[in-house]
Amino acid sequence: MEESETVLKLRRQLKEAEEERVKAAHYGLELLESQSDLQNQLEEQRNEMTGTIENLEQEKYSLQREVELKNRMLESVTSECENIRQQQKLILEQLQEQLERNHHRELGEIKDKLEKLKAELDEARLSEKQLKHKLEYQTEVLANKSEELRMMSERVHETMSSEMLTLQLEKTELESAKANLEQEVNELQYREQQLLLTNGTQSRKLEHLQTEKEEREKESVGYFSALEKAREANQDLQAQLDIALQQAQDPNSKGNSLFSEVEDRRAEMERQLISMKVQFQSLQKQHAFSRQQMHRMKVQIATLLQMKGSQSDPEQLERLQAMVAQKNSEIEALVMKVRQLEKSQQVSENGPAVGSSDNLGQGDETYYVDLLKMKLLNSSKENEKIKDELSLQRMKALAESQRVLELERKLFANDRHLKLSQGENMKLRVSLDEIKMKYEPDEMGKIHTQKRRKEQLPLDFPMDNTSAAVTSGTEAQGLYDATAGETCTAESTDGRIHSKEDLSLSTKEQDPSSVAVKPKELPNGPPPKERKRVRIMEDENNAQDLNKRNTHNCSVTSASPRSTSEDATSESKRFDEEQEKRKQERKSRLRAPPVLHVPSKPNATTQCPQQ
């Protein structure tokens, strides 16, 4: 039940996907028609816009000439005002910079004095602290010495031995040495504190010097910018001087008829130049728009090819579903047969017991029983021989089916790799176009004008259930396996001939299957590039022998793990139906003009020719 539900669910999903595919095709046709209409409207609007823009540019040019004549009268006054303003501005900026420099200088001097006073204050505090510590230490030492003198004076009056006196003297000497060492340690600590203080002052001085260095760098940058501004002003003045010299040498002021005629021709040529510029800009915008559309279309084609490579073939899925359903039915039949055999075995086990009781009553019929046993043994031996032959034929059929499945699996894997490589190739082309558009736009335009390529979208073709039919995809895959580096597109007839030869060699090396090449004929036009279709077919003699063996095996046993006879008959029927469908579709294509469809699901037929 669960398997049937899954099969129904998958069929429903397949039907929905086919409906979506048909809808997408209709929508694509509508979009193409609307795009052509919009393209025509855009062309008309562009022509109108170019005409209006040209008229407006001519009017603009005439008005500009009038405005220039009027502006020349105002330029002298504005130039004088601007010069005065610039002079005042420069003076003000110089004063501000001078005041800022003086302020920074005074501020730095005050900071230096403050740092020096802080350092002197820290040194005075440290020296005061050290003197206090020394004073405390000297008072302690004085108290200890006075105490020792008092103790010595008391002990002098007492009677002591010479040893005690020597020990006492040694003790005093050691204490004096200890006091000297402590004093040295304190002096070293004082020295360390002074060094730390001087280190801190030096670090502060270093920071101050770094800040001064940064300020000097900023001042140098300011001076450099001022120098650049002065250079720019000098260049402007030089340009104004050149303009003034040209105006002084203007032939219009002389009133010569030849120069006036030349001026009229120049104005007319400028008008023509304006019109040509307007047309060039409009054509350039149109070219950029079409290039963006082509780039977007290439990106979409790359994504579609990648989706084709990632998705699976619906006809292959249907065939696998049919095989799964057939194997499930075979398993059910085998289970029923096993149950029947178990029941018959139980009956046969119960039968001999009853027969033995009858034999006790009928001892005279033992001869007939032995005869029947001998016949039964002979028939069982013949049955075992037939079963051995049947198992051998089954193994052969299983090996053949496994070989066919392996070849189909390899073919579909190669087709998938081909689609992925085509998607990657299209992405690389898109990235190459982007890089050329980014770094070499002029070269890109020249290449497009010199060499044009026509890319054809992959069309949908029905596939056989028994043979995986692939078009130029398998051709390019065989070429890739044979040469390890060539692409799926051929730019000349020689390349196509070489690809055909490589394809024939590669298909002969892969499997002993026949290759059927069927070119597609188109009405009303030159014949296009031939599309090849590789089909795996079994040999007729092998198929007939296999059908005979399978019919014989099916007569012996009702069901088997590999019912090859039913598969062969069903596959032959499907093959005939597919051949009839192809003939009808070929007739319909010859009658009606071909329509370009963009498939929403992957197909085994892919082609990327370049013309």
UniProtKB/Swiss-Prot annotation:
Name recorded for this polypeptide: Protein Spindly-A
Region entry Disordered, spans: 487-611
Molecular function (Gene Ontology), one example: kinetochore binding
Amino acid composition bias (Basic and acidic residues), ranges on this chain: 493-511, 570-583
InterPro entries on file: SPDLY_chordates, Spindly/BICDR_Dynein_Adapter
Segments of skewed composition (Polar residues): 552-567, 602-611
Keywords for this protein: Cell cycle, Cell division, Centromere, Chromosome, Coiled coil, Kinetochore, Mitosis
One GO location term (cellular component): spindle pole
Highest taxon of the lineage: Eukaryota
Biological process annotations from GO: cell division; establishment of mitotic spindle orientation; mitotic metaphase chromosome alignment; mitotic spindle assembly checkpoint signaling; protein localization to kinetochore
Coiled-coil spans in chain: 1-390
